[in-house]
Amino acid sequence: MKSTFLWTACVTPFNCSGDSIDYQSLQRLLTMQAETENGVVLLGSTGESLSLTDSEKRTLVEFVCELKLNTKIIIGVPGVNLYQTLEWLDFCKGMPIHGYLMTTPIYAKPGIMGQTLWFEKLLEKAHVPAMLYNIPSRAGVSLHAETVRNLSSHEKFWAIKDSSGTVDTLTQYKKVAPNIEVFCGDDNMIPDMAAKGAAGLVSVAANVWPSVVHEYVKQCMSGENPQADSWQQACKTLFTASNPIPTKALLHDIGLIEHKTVRLPLSTEDLPSIETLRQANKMILGWKELTNS
C-alpha cells in the first residue's frame, strides 16, 4: 500500500434518469485511473454511496473486481449502523480488494471511546488494511487524536484520510501515531500537507485529470511546490456546489461520462456555472503542456 501516493475518490456515473449505474462510463473512468497507476476509492462520499442501495453497492464492487484492473482498490465502509456495516464487511471479505475507507460515524457525534469501540469492531472484521476517514464537515465530529492513539497498534489500521481543512490535524495524528500514514483529503491542500509529511492524496480532481494530478502530487511529494496558487484555484472550482456535482458536470462536459446526473438530495441545478469549470480545465491542461515542454 505504501507505494501508492495518489488515490482517486471515484464518482459513480448514472444513466440520464439516475435510476441505474452507467457501468460503461464507470469502466472508462477506472481504466484511465489504472493506466495512470492511481489507486481507486469506490463508494465514498464522492461516489454517492449513501444514495445507492445495498444491491447496487454489491453489484458495483463485483463489477469492478471482475475488470481485474492493474491497480489497487479501496472500498468505502459506511459509518451509520454497526450491524449493517459489519454485514458489508462480511460481503467484502470475498472480494479481491486491497483496503477499506472507514468513515467516522456520522450524525451520532461519538466521543473518544465511542469512536474507539466502533473502529475496533470494524477493524476486527476487516480482512485487509483500513484507512480511517476524518471528515468533520460531513460526520459532524472529528476523528479524535486520542482515538487514533488508542487504535494505533491494531494490525489492520494502516492510514488516515484527513479532510479537516487544516495542517494542524495531520501534525496531531503524526504525533500520537507516528506509525500511521496520513493522506491529504483535500486537493487544494496537498502542497502544504506534503510539506508536513503527508503520505499522499485522496483526490476528487483526479477523476477529471488523472495524469496531471498524479504528476502534480509526485512533485509535491518530492519537495517541489509547482504553481500552488493556480492549482488551488482550479481545485476549488470542483467544490462550487456539493461534491460530486461539479466534478460530474465537468466529466460530462469533456465527454468522459454520458450523463452528469446525481441522485437526490443532490441536484445539478445547484451548480452556479459550467464556465468556471471549463476555465479550470483549461488552466490545468495549460499546466500540463507547460510541464511537458
Swiss-Prot record:
Q: Where in the cell is it found?
A: Cytoplasm
The record's section on InterPro entries has: Aldolase_TIM, DapA, DapA-like, Schiff_base-form_aldolases_AS, Schiff_base-form_aldolases_CS
Entry binding sites for pyruvate: 46, 202
Where in the sequence is the active site?
133 (proton donor/acceptor), 161 (schiff-base intermediate with substrate)
Keyword Transferase on entry: no
Q: What class of enzyme is it?
A: lyase
The Gene Ontology biological process annotation of the record reads: diaminopimelate biosynthetic process; lysine biosynthetic process via diaminopimelate
Identify the pathway. Amino-acid biosynthesis; L-lysine biosynthesis via DAP pathway; (S)-tetrahydrodipicolinate from L-aspartate: step 3/4
Protein's UniProt keywords contain Cytoplasm = yes
The UniProt keywords, alphabetically, are: Amino-acid biosynthesis, Cytoplasm, Diaminopimelate biosynthesis, Lyase, Lysine biosynthesis, Schiff base
**Listed CDD domains:** DHDPS
Q: Where is this site: Part of a proton relay during catalysis?
A: 45, 107
Subunit arrangement?
Homotetramer; dimer of dimers.
Q: What does this protein do?
A: Catalyzes the condensation of (S)-aspartate-beta-semialdehyde [(S)-ASA] and pyruvate to 4-hydroxy-tetrahydrodipicolinate (HTPA).
Would you tell me the protein name for this molecule? 4-hydroxy-tetrahydrodipicolinate synthase
Source organism (scientific name): Wolbachia pipientis subsp. Culex pipiens (strain wPip)
* Organism lineage string: Bacteria, Pseudomonadati, Pseudomonadota, Alphaproteobacteria, Rickettsiales
